[in-house]
């Protein structure tokens, strides 16, 4: 279809502005398709992908959530949703690592630590639901295990570690 054509052309283009133009056209066509099929989770997922690629993370989050609403077993939508949430982590970690040892820096470090933990906590329900839908998804299990480790939820960390070991034999 026309939307697929635009995304393929954009993927094959070496020209950044041309690629952006085709991706915008793809996005417009996906938005039009949603007006005709408003409960199609795949359309929302595609909009999430394009929004994420364009740095529109708030829109991407909403589109992924809508994709899951209409297609609750959509593994890729859960994975991408968590990835977008965790996208904010690197800037937090970078700032944490750049701080010194002054009282002001220690206060800022503690604030950033809370922000980082909040990102992790936001991911937990999506990862848990994803694991319900896809119980052997190692990426989701590892991510959830790591989050539990950072948050100090040792029992949950051990439970997820045991599941991973069971799956991997």
Where are these regions (language model features)?
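Residue at a conserved register position within TPR or TPR-like alpha-solenoid repeats
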Residues: 6, 13, 51, 85, ...
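Canonical positions in the second alpha-helix
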Residues: 32-33, 66-67, 130, 164
